Amino acid sequence: MLFTALFSLITQLLYNIRFAVSSKDIVRNENLYSKLAYTMQKYALKRYKIKQMFIFTLTKIAICYKILISVIFERIVVTMGLTLTEKILKAHLVDGEFVKGQEIGIRIDQTLTQDATGTMAYLEYEAMGVPRVRTEKSVAYIDHNTLQSGFENADDHRFIGSVCKKHGIYFSRPGNGICHQVHLERFGIPGKTLIGSDSHTPTGGGIGMIAIGAGGLDVAVAMGGGAYYITYPKIVKVNLTGKLSPWVSAKDVILEVLRRMSVKGGVGKVIEYCGEGVKTLTVPERATITNMGAELGATTSIFPSDETTLAFLKAQDRADVWSELKADDDAVYDEQIDIDLSQLVPLAACPHSPDNVKSVNEIGKLKIDQVCIGSCTNSSYVDMMKVAHILKGKTVDPSVSLAIAPGSKQVLNMIAENGALADMIAAGARILESACGPCIGMGQSPNSKGVSLRTFNRNFEGRSGTKDGQIYLVSPEMAAVSALTGYLTDPRTLGDMPEFKLPEHFKINDNMVVPPANEADMDSVEVLRGPNIKPFPQTSPLDDSIDCQVSLKVGDNITTDHIMPAGAKILPLRSNIPAISQHCFTVCDEDFPRRAKNMGKSIIVGGSNYGQGSSREHAALAPLYLGIKAVLVKSFARIHRANLINAGILPLTFVNEADYDKINQGDEIVLADVRADVEADMSKLTVVNKTTGVEIPVLCELTGRTKDIILAGGLLDYTREQLSK
């Protein structure tokens, strides 16, 4: 019995061994060591009987125990490899246990903002009272609101520029390029962590960074030296083999991944690309793939840092920041997808979702009205050179409008010098400035019911600025050849493809990046505030109970473009929450802002994948201003859920999705004693529909930290409390 008892103790020890061993992610071996422990226990019960002297037996058992544990420790520590994602996260871990599914806090090395989300991020940063950023590098980009049809955008840009100068942030001026393209070229470093107030920040994964899109307040906290919190993600291995066929592109790779996984298939996951096929892709091609990983709902996507990465950095005169990074050979992944690059064909994402993917042959003959080439997904030097090659000596079809936006000043300069830009112009292309432009509905809206081929990353309904526009997401190669024919055209009809190589040396000119003032001079810098700059909206601690009406009920896959539209008319209001809130949800219900404001406080009910798309925290701040106290849905998109918590809005999900049908717009909903329940760490709450008398179980899944944020009334108030301690 003694022997059996001791082996039972070993069994328990093995289940808890992860707390004794360094964070080699021992938990992954739980099946291995639990089976081993069970076998030992069973063996002890059946085979051993205590027949020897007590002391002799105890000594023998102790020796066996020591040897056994030593062997098990050595086996687990030696054999368990790490994924690339785990290596970087582990190196940056500052809070929490390195255990899958748990919340962890990581140190952030770099941040980026763009101007549509940046104004609010810097207002939030100022409110924290931290005099100078504490990151290794923070950069503010002006690339969204570049259509200055009124004073608002120009005023906001002056505000951002002055904040940057005062607080230690680099400022990329209008015209220097799209944030993700420029950051990849000039600031990205393998192995570093980056968060940005734009959902396509994972572009940095193409250079081997853990690069994550986040809300502006999360970025502000990181600039102040705070950790960024995520749930330890599942890690999906995408094993690439073979080589892309002529005229098949990196865009087709990510469209294939979207076709397989869907727009919510990546939620809670990091997509890690591995395999021999990786070597055949350049850094800009890899960045195209990681960029659109955002459309999977993934936390981020990442490629290894290898000789190809080194070649790119050398060409940018930044070889000194390179380091080789890859997963261990015996790394264990949660899922695996295998893609033979040689088997891929030209693909297109059809209206109105990036995962509505079909081959060009499946779509068939399709008359088009417009082609737009550019965006942070496909505006690199090689993308532009391919387009110029296809257009050279030809003319755009008379029925098609072709617009091209190079991704950065560097790219624009180089294609201007080598003649590629002249070839585009001669063919009939309209050249736009190096900015986001049409991708965010900032100009170039298609005609009514117009069919537009775009090399962008999103084709949500109405995002183009034309509500009934039919937007197809395609590669630059398909876009260019289709502009010539007037129909959706397979680029493989072009025949042999010439080799397009990255240059050995890019043209380096960082004169449009303004460095901050020296720390000694920062106090003399005046922050410039125009009349469009309004303070962060007031928040309040979580109420004792919530008793209010449902002001809006919406369906599945509601995007942040539905919640807080973009476009040339609305984007200039991003620093003015009272004004921009008047457009909240108007694409779904024009009366919502007035109705919600009149109710004083209310609840929104939605379907699955609520809040997918852009990282814009305005999709939480505008509802906050309109009195929204809670959002009850089937499931949330990651970034939007975090933004709701940061705004102090309670995120709730149905226990049973069928209960969605038991609540209607206008119903009165009660969450009694909700504050006490949250304080008591109760994850299962009860919503009472007073209108119908039905009780509905809901989940309120908060960690210790996010619970405190909700109780405080949002991340800004929570951070102020922490800084005051």
Predicted stretch roles:
Residues 5:
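Flexible, polar/acidic helix-loop-strand segments at domain edges
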Residues 77-725:
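Fe-S-dependent hydro-lyases/dehydratases of central metabolism
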Residues 15-17, 22, 33-39, 43-44, ...:
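Short, positively charged and aromatic/hydrophobic N-terminal segments
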Residues 10-13:
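Hydrophobic, low-acid, alpha-helix-prone terminal segments
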Residues 28:
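Family-specific functional microsites
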Residues 8, 22-23:
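Low-acidity, Ser/Thr- and Arg-rich intrinsically disordered low-complexity segments
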